[in-house]
């Protein structure tokens, strides 16, 4: 594959026109075979791994020959072998061919994605979720409106195949892809004759499909916004959710002035900022209300004409930043005014001026998190701590470590908020729930548990020093960090409680739209 990459730099046209012969390379299936065994060994016991898991290249060639037929029935995933291992053999060869198909498609896509968006010449890898917030702090306070939309999951398989034709001219290589997509659609029994492309399916093929789908949407969207908005700048950041392409892109695209600037869209310094985390894009706009309505209308038309997806107008929300909050990964986001007192001394006179700046204010959703803690049986619905009965069979150290880990992860994730009073309310709930769990285990009271285990035990587990022990700061810097917000670069995924709240929030919005 590395050799194919090197050849592709010299002749990219060969990549786009002759992908199909790669399906008959034995090295390709050796790679897919090893990857399949690695995944299987982690999910199956060792006694289920036998010598029968050997790849027959002749069987693979026959299977590819069947896929080449114009029959969209169960060609890829049907095995007529009557022996008891037929189901496992069927899955074995299916996964191997699917893995090989993904490897072939990933090579031209990785090259195409670098040049898919015009003007994107800077691409860096950021695996931390908190990398989204510095981008928001830099761009969003200067905007006055937000368009909140979500990338639709449902898409017809033929639409995906047609979009692949834009950058793959080798028609035979599209037949296996079409067969796989139609087979997946038929297996889900979808009445709308479409497939659901989600990044949470833990297979390499669907992760690639999601990355391609998102990149295709964004490349077309950016180019059209560039032509239609006539704005002077457009910045964007992309934060895929734990897929193969982790990146943050931030670049300014300068638009040429045209005669159309004399029209109604000749606004004073309009700007568009695009940021995406996972399947949720947010577009921040600085400009008049007409520009916001135009972008919102374009998003609906874009989905309808390019991907044949009908979306009701109210499914693309627009609201003003100064009056409403927007929910991002685990936070409520709003723009607040920050007054600054400036003193200037000139000769013998002292001038005092008040400057007001806008800044992003991330708010921790305390009440929803307490509701989630009540669902997990750490407290009741009013926030009163209760014992975690399912953990009473654990040792004392395990109980303390689990409660302490929940608190540290929660505080670590929400360290970017100025107001942490609500966080310490959650700390109180967790610490008292921990004490009640230990008391329930030993069939005694909290006072007896504190006396037997020592009063310093809970202070050690829930101390403020342990909240900042992962920071490479001195003690003075750690004390100062309690009054400041910190964005961490070591958070690979959203906090489970924050993720649960975000899903509930999205579900409420969806139900509100469906009414």
UniProtKB/Swiss-Prot annotation:
It is found in: Plastid, Chloroplast. Usually encoded in the trnK tRNA gene intron. Probably assists in splicing its own and other chloroplast group II introns. This is Maturase K. GO terms for cellular component: chloroplast. InterPro entries: Domain_X, Maturase_MatK, Maturase_MatK_N. Belongs to the intron maturase 2 family. MatK subfamily. The keyword Cell inner membrane does not apply. The gene is matK. GO terms for biological process: mRNA processing; RNA splicing; tRNA processing.
């Amino acid at each position: 594959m590395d050799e194919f990459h090197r050849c592709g730099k010299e002749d990219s046209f060969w990549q786009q026109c002759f992908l199909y012969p790669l399906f008959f390379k034995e090295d390709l299936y050796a790679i897919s075979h090893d990857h399949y065994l690695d995944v299987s060994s982690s999910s199956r016991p060792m006694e289920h791994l036998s010598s029968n898991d050997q790849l027959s290249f002749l069987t693979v060639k026959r299977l590819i020959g069947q896929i080449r037929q114009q029959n969209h029935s169960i060609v890829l995933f049907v095995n007529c072998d009557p022996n008891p291992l037929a189901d496992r053999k069927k899955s074995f060869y299916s996964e191997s061919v699917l893995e090989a198909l993904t490897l072939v498609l990933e090579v031209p896509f990785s090259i195409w994605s670098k040049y898919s968006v015009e003007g994107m010449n800077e691409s860096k890898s950021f695996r931390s979720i908190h990398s989204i917030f510095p981008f928001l702090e830099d761009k969003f306070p200067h905007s006055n409106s937000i368009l909140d939309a979500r990338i639709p999951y449902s898409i017809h398989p033929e639409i995906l195949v047609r979009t692949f034709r834009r950058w793959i001219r080798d028609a035979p290589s599209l037949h296996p892809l079409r067969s796989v997509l139609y087979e997946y659609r038929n297996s889900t029994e979808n009445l709308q004759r479409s497939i659901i492309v989600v990044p949470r399916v833990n297979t390499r093929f669907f992760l690639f499909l999601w990355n391609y789908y998102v990149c295709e949407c964004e490349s077309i969207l950016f180019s059209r916004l560039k032509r239609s908005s006539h704005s002077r700048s457009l910045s964007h950041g992309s934060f895929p959710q734990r897929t193969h392409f982790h990146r943050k892109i931030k670049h300014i695209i300068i638009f040429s002035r045209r005669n159309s600037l004399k029209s109604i869209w000749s606004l004073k310094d309009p700007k568009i900022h695009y940021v995406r985390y996972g399947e949720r894009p947010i577009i921040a706009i600085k400009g008049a209300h007409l520009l916001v309505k135009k972008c919102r209308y374009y998003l609906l038309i874009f989905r309808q004409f390019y991907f044949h997806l009908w979306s009701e107008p109210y499914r693309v929300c627009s609201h003003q930043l100064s009056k409403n909050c927007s929910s991002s990964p685990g936070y409520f986001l709003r723009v607040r005014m920050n007054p600054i007192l400036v003193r200037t001394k000139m000769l013998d006179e002292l001038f005092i001026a008040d400057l007001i700046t806008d800044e992003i204010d991330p708010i921790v959703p305390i009440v929803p998190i307490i509701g989630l803690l009540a669902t997990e049986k750490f407290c009741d619905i009013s926030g009163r701590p209760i014992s975690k009965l399912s953990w009473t069979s654990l040792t004392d150290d395990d109980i303390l470590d689990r409660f302490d880990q929940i608190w540290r992860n929660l505080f670590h994730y929400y360290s970017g908020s100025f107001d942490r009073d609500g966080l310490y309310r959650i700390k109180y709930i967790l610490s008292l729930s921990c004490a009640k769990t230990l008391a329930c285990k030993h069939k005694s009271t909290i006072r007896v548990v504190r006396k037997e285990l020592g009063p310093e035990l809970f202070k050690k587990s829930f101390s403020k020093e342990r909240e900042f022990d992962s920071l490479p700061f001195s003690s003075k810097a750690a004390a100062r960090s309690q009054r400041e917000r910190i964005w961490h670069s070591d958070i690979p995924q959203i906090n489970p409680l924050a993720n649960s709240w975000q899903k509930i929030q999205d579900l409420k919005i969806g139900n509100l739209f469906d009414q």
